[in-house]
Regions:
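Glycine-centered flexibility sites
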Residues: 3-5, 43, 59
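Acidic glycine-/aspartate-rich tracts in secreted/extracellular proteins
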Residues: 7-10, 29-31, 50-53, 59-61
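Short amphipathic alpha-helical segments
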Residues: 16-17, 59
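Extracellular/surface-exposed low-complexity repeats and stalk/linker segments enriched in Gly/Pro
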Residues: 17-51, 66-68
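Short sequence segments immediately N-terminal to proteolytic processing junctions that release a mature
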Residues: 1-16
């Protein structure tokens, strides 16, 4: 596991980000750029700058994250 901002990352996480002043910035792209990804893996997440929404690939189609 990898820790960023921590010397003791959680053993339950592959990536543990710790900060009280910064956030996580996901890859940002347009719908056209998103659709150009060949064979995306299920679970892939991007921030769509065309719609200003989070998108994830469900294994067969892109969907909008509607509620967190």
């Amino acid at each position: 596991n990898v820790g960023i901002g921590t010397t003791a990352p959680s053993s339950k996480a592959i990536l543990d980000l710790t900060s009280t002043t910064k956030g996580l910035l996901l890859p940002r792209m347009t719908t056209t750029q998103r659709d150009a990804i060949t064979s995306p893996d299920a679970g892939l997440i991007i921030y769509n700058t065309t719609s200003n929404k989070l998108n994830f690939y469900n294994g067969s189609a892109w969907e909008v994250v509607t509620s967190l």
